Amino acid sequence: MKIFYIRHAPTMANINGDIVEDYDGQSIVFFDKDKWHEKVGSNLPKDFKLFISPAKRCKETAKALFPDKEYTVVQDLAEFDLSELNKSGHKFWEIDEETFNKYIFLPERSIINRWLNALGSMLCKCDSNDDTVVVIGHGFYGRLVNEIYENNDDSVFDILNSKNFSFGNLDMMEIDKRKVVNVWRY
């Protein structure tokens, strides 16, 4: 299975670095769809199955980028709840590892298991192992996939904070044969 993984379009919380209570209530903000299709989307094959996180911003991104395409929601692609970090009083990019670990318990193994469960769900919906899928999800999973395949040995905090790999809104990576083979930046 070849996977093209796209991070959802930006929200005001992304832009402002806000940690929000209601992750699924965030709507996307305007972005230039023509520019995205020219810089990023032109690298997609014509035929693919579309899978998305259940978050509102992922559904809105799917409808904006692929208005005529049906999609399947994959629960295991859901965002992780980091709202406890609100108690720190910081913007997301101001949080250090000690503060993160004080408020959040998020073992790397559980994150990897969710990604593997998501892959299993997607594979079950494909007609063959050779199908191409497009996934619209969260930046965290994009960075995690890079971590898994590049073996950087980063902590969960490092992955969240893009220590060795940045994956911005509307960026896309191609994953084939258990490695990241291309990354396109919006």
Residues of each region from the PLM?
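Residues at the C-termini of beta-strands that transition into short coil/loop
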Residues: R7, V74-L77, D176, W184
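Beta-strand elements within well-structured catalytic alpha/beta cores of enzymes
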Residues: K2-I6, F51, D130-Y141
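Short, solvent-exposed loop/turn segments at secondary-structure junctions
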Residues: A9-M12, A55-C58, A78-F80, G139-G142, ...
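Phosphate-handling substructures
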Residues: V20-F31, L65-S121, N161
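Domain-level recognition of soluble alpha/beta enzyme cores
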Residues: D153-Y186
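A short acidic (Asp/Glu
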Residues: N16, E60-A64, E84, L144-Y149
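Active-site-proximal alpha-helix that buttresses catalytic centers in soluble enzyme cores
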Residues: K2-V74, Y103, P107, G168
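Glycine-rich phosphate-binding loop signature in dinucleotide/nucleotide-binding domains
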Residues: N43-K46, K125-T132
